[in-house]
């Protein structure tokens, strides 16, 4: 064969093998024996070996390969991967349905799906090619695990879809694979994984993709982050179209027209969850209409149009051996139960929450008691009650100390608070917890500065304040345990990079009481610089939407403290930037025809890419959304605009051509 013939042969083998793989891994309905598949694969491998320049990206041979990575790169999700609010009973579900119905004028239907117990991931395709796979991370920033995801054979390396498509799903380990993996680990005298979720997450975070390839992972796709060329109008249409494109979706989803149908679905799977070949930990319920999803919108943490029903928590009994106290960054003293190890909901539990002194006293929980442990939402273990009838008289009552176990200062109970608190600003436990918070992902996001490293730096007296982090030098760090040349270099680079963070990250990292990440962003947008915020009065802060009196009081008191002024001065001198880097109110166009308008883009654009058009509209003060609703002001229609244009015309929404957008830009 000449090279052109070889190229055609390779193309036909890839097409055939990918079809066989789709039938086997996605449809679970193979049409050829394994031996025939293997023979065709060997033929392809030989041709690719003889003609390496003809190897194609969507070849099944490209699923595993390449050297192990040094580390995972960070990935920013264009559309955040938010977590869902939780429902634990029928009333929670009915309340969710009522809130959703109150938020829209039209009748609501729901889609119910099994909540797969695995690792949330994102897959991005550009013009049909799989270009990136990432973990959810904190919802805004994840890790690039493309090489590992390529080893999952139910993930297509190419699809027939132009433009950008980002799909979301759950990578998981089937029961059969989990049992086989743990058998192998025990045979090799390795620690077995506690549950399939941990096994799946651990496999996908291996730097060597060949390890992930051996773990027999699978995936279900359940949603869309971005879809450049879609005119679909419902979540159920998304699921159907994803399946048509070759993605593996879970067949057990159901469209429900009433909340009673939803509850019936939930009850069925609560009873039958153990019949499945994979783990589920609940049911996800979503409003089906994309327009209604748009209307309902989001809170800071989750969409208002979806909720996760969590199965009833599992319980187990064990012995409470001791009660330890920990001090948080705000000085709150939290008791934790130390337990004899016990298996609950697939994991081994040795510590559990006791919340506060009042709970211990009210429930008469004693050291030495037999106690019932429950995993709330199958995640956080907590002590539910003591088994009083099993007491033998040796149990000891627990009393909270009068002094802080970390610094010896008197513990106090502030007005209207249940918890005891240490109010010593120099308490070492609070300082250390504050540093751990400062470097965390939602705050300054300093890679390589995990809890263990912070504790080590604190105990070695190298870091006592946030400013000290920016004074660390290479020689000091090299003296620490497990800190080699490369890890020290990477750490110092990460610390240096964090100096360029936008103001909201620094504000959140400072740990001001009552100020979460959303409030920090609101303050940063409003005041734009740390200096402006430091000068702000109580009235200035309270005047901002979403900032209440407790927050305003906390902010003003915080910046009035001398040690805070000194800390911020030190951070400035060390090069930490203190300005908001997002779109500023003072820079937003207010005289533009698009200012304050909600805009939808549809159809194919000739002069602008979707991304360029979106950036232009936002720079002129507009907001771009994905679907047409009564809240839409303008629809900009390119060629083949489809159903979004039809809906805009029915609703009487202003429709622009691409030329009209260009004319506005020209002005």
Curated annotation (Swiss-Prot):
GO-annotated molecular function: DNA binding; DNA ligase (NAD+) activity; metal ion binding
Amino acids binding NAD(+): 34-38, 83-84, 113, 136, 170, 286, 310
Binding-site list for Zn(2+): 404, 407, 422, 427
Manganese as UniProt keyword: yes
Keyword line: DNA damage, DNA repair, DNA replication, Ligase, Magnesium, Manganese, Metal-binding, NAD, Zinc
Membrane-spanning residues: none
InterPro entries (UniProt xref): BRCT_dom, BRCT_dom_sf, DisA/LigA_HHH, DNA_ligase, DNA_ligase_AS, DNA_ligase_CS, DNAligase_adenylation, DNAligase_N
Active-site residues from the entry: 115
Pfam entry (one): HHH_2
Similarity field: Belongs to the NAD-dependent DNA ligase family. LigA subfamily.
NCBIfam families: dnlj (TIGR00575), PRK07956.1 (NF005932)
Chain's role: DNA ligase that catalyzes the formation of phosphodiester linkages between 5'-phosphoryl and 3'-hydroxyl groups in double-stranded DNA using NAD as a coenzyme and as the energy source for the reaction. It is essential for DNA replication and repair of damaged DNA.
Name listed for the protein in its UniProt record: DNA ligase
Organism encoding this protein: Oceanobacillus iheyensis (strain DSM 14371 / CIP 107618 / JCM 11309 / KCTC 3954 / HTE831)
Source taxonomy: Bacteria, Bacillati, Bacillota, Bacilli, Bacillales
The encoding gene: ligA
């Amino acid at each position: 064969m000449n090279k052109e013939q070889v190229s055609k042969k390779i193309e036909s083998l890839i097409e055939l093998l990918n079809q066989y793989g789709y039938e086997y891994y996605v449809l679970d309905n193979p049409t050829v024996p394994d031996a025939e598949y293997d023979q065709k694969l060997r033929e392809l491998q030989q041709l690719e070996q003889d003609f390496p320049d003809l190897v194609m990206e969507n070849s099944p041979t490209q699923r595993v390969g390449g050297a192990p990575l040094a580390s995972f790169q960070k990935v920013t999700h264009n559309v955040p991967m938010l977590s869902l609010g939780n429902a634990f009973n029928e009333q929670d579900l009915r309340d969710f349905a009522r809130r959703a119905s109150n938020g829209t004028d039209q009748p609501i239907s729901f889609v119910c799906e099994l909540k797969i117990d695995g690792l949330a991931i994102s897959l991005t395709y550009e013009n049909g090619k799989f270009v990136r796979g990432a973990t959810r991370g904190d919802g805004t920033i994840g890790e690039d695990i493309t090489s590992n995801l390529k080893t999952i054979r139910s993930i297509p390396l190419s699809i027939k879809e132009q433009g950008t498509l980002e799909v979301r799903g759950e990578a998981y380990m089937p029961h059969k694979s989990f049992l086989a993996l743990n058998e192998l680990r025990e045979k090799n005298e390795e620690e077995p994984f506690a549950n399939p979720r941990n096994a799946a997450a651990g496999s996908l975070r291996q730097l060597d993709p060949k390890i992930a390839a051996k773990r027999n992972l699978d995936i279900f796709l359940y949603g869309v982050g971005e879809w450049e060329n879609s005119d679909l109008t419902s979540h159920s249409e998304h699921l159907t179209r994803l399946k048509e494109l070759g993605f593996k979706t879970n067949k057990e989803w159901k469209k429900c027209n009433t909340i009673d149908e939803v509850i019936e679905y939930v009850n069925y799977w609560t009873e039958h969850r153990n019949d499945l070949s994979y783990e589920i930990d609940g049911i996800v319920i979503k409003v089906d209409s994309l327009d209604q999803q748009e209307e309902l919108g989001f809170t800071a943490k989750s969409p208002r149009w979806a909720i996760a029903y969590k199965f009833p928590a599992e319980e187990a009994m064990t012995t409470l051996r001791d009660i330890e106290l920990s001090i948080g960054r705000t000085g709150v003293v939290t008791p934790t139960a130390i337990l004899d190890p016990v298996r609950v909901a697939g994991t081994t539990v040795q510590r559990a929450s006791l919340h506060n002194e009042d709970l211990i006293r009210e429930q008469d929980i004693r050291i030495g008691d037999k106690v019932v442990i429950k995993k709330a939402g199958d995640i956080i273990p907590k002590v539910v009650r003591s088994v009083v009838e099993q007491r033998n008289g040796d149990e000891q009552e627990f009393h909270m100390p009068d002094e802080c176990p970390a610094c010896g200062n008197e513990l106090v109970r502030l007005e209207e608070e249940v918890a005891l608190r240490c109010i010593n600003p120099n308490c070492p436990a609070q300082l250390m917890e504050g540093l751990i918070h400062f470097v965390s992902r939602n705050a300054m996001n300093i890679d390589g500065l995990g809890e263990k490293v912070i504790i080590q730096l604190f105990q070695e007296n190298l870091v006592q304040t946030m400013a000290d982090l920016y004074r660390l030098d290479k020689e000091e760090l090299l003296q620490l345990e497990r800190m080699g040349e490369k890890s020290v270099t990477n750490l110092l680079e990460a610390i240096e990079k964090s100096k360029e963070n936008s103001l909201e990250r620094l504000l959140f990292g400072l740990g001001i009481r009552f100020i979460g990440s959303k409030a920090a962003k609101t303050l940063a947008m409003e005041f734009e610089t740390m200096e402006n915020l430091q000068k702000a009065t109580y009235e200035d802060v309270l005047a901002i939407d979403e900032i209440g009196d407790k927050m305003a009081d906390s902010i003003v008191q915080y910046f009035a403290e001398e040690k805070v002024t000194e800390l911020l001065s030190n951070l400035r001198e060390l090069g930490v930037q203190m300005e908001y880097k997002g779109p500023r109110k003072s820079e937003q166009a207010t005289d533009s025809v698009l200012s304050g308008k909600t805009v939808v883009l549809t159809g194919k654009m000739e002069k602008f890419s979707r991304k360029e058009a979106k950036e232009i509209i936002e720079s002129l003060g507009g907001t771009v959304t994905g679907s047409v609703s009564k809240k839409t002001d303008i629809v900009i229609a390119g060629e083949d605009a489809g159903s979004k244009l039809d809906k805009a015309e029915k609703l009487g929404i202003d429709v622009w051509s691409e030329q009209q957008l260009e004319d506005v830009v020209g002005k």
